Amino acid sequence: MDWNGTSADGYTGVDVVKGMLDITSNPAFMAVADGDMSNQLASGNLAACVSGTWDAITAKEIFGDGYAATKLPTFTVGDKQVQQGSVAGYKYVGVNGYSENSGWAVLLAEYLTNEESQQMFFDQRESGPSNKNVAASDSVQENVALAALAAQSEYAQAQKVGGKYWDPAKTFGELIAQGTLSADDDNAIQEALDNLVEGAAASVE
């Protein structure tokens, strides 16, 4: 969907950014740097957070009996409620068949992806297992964070971005999170969107 143009539902990129600014201007909102969510949870400053399953164990420890997880909420765009989307991805374990030690590489790949290792990764980090037997276990099926991730997956798009995407996206996110943009300045919002698209679409050198 081209949020820098006009969506099939009639929303423009400017409309969406205004909705985002409405969230970040709320005094209850706190922008948390990448990798710092666990520290902020431990500080007791957060009543809720938007994060991934990698922070589930910390959140469970901090919130105790009050711990819960769900899909992302809707937010206001114009006069309507719009479901927040997300990106979804996965990681391959690949082996270079031309490697000098390709045999050992295959053994390592088999070890990382086998049932025992995938169970261990889930037990220690609550990461979604790729092994079918582990994924079908009661502990995985009943996991609160993974259930929330599954619910959000209906609104997620596969992550297909180039290497030039991340820096412009970070800059754009900081403009919103820090309140640099004003919801009353359509031109400045559109310029920020144009810069984001231009940077993300730049050729990889």
Descriptions of predicted regions:
Residues 21-28, 45, 59-63, 112-116, ...:
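Sec/Tat-exported extracytoplasmic proteins
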Residues 47-52, 68:
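Paired acidic/hydrophobic, glycine-rich loop segments that form the ligand-binding mouth/hinge
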Residues 2-31:
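Glycine-centered hinge/linker elements that transmit conformational signals in sensory
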Residues 61-124:
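Extracytoplasmic/periplasmic substrate-recognition and gating elements
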Residues 12-19, 100-112, 120, 185-188, ...:
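Short amphipathic alpha-helical coupling segments at ligand-binding clamshell hinges
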Residues 29-42:
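Short helix-initiation/N-cap motifs at beta->coil->alpha
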Residues 1-2, 87-95, 166-177:
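Periplasmic solute-binding protein
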